Amino acid sequence: MKYFFALLITLFFTMPAWAVDVSMGSGGNLVFEPDEITISAGETVHFINEALPPHNIIVEARPDLSREALLFAPGETQDVVFADAGDYEFFCGPHQGAGMTGVIHVQ
């Protein structure tokens, strides 16, 4: 029993941080869904390309968080870890003018 408890404690502290999924181009629309989320510092946002055309993630205030490589195929993903608290506006480079924008609130 002592070893089982130790194993549970170890697993609890080694579990990865939660990830929040954000769809890109869902339903063929030029949108992020959801386009506004709130997460805790250290959490991962998992961006998923749901449809053509290509998309990317630009965080203008923090270029180090941007994922400028284009995701061409449905199902391609990019992960971004937000370590610092703040509000992060982001957009898809090719589709910003069409309104493909969002904001991530990190607490």
Positions of predicted regions on the chain:
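Extracytoplasmic copper-binding redox domains, predominantly the cupredoxin/blue-copper superfamily
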Residues: A17-Q107
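Positively charged n-region of N-terminal signal peptides that target proteins for export
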Residues: M1-F4
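Cleavable N-terminal signal peptides
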Residues: A6-L7, A17
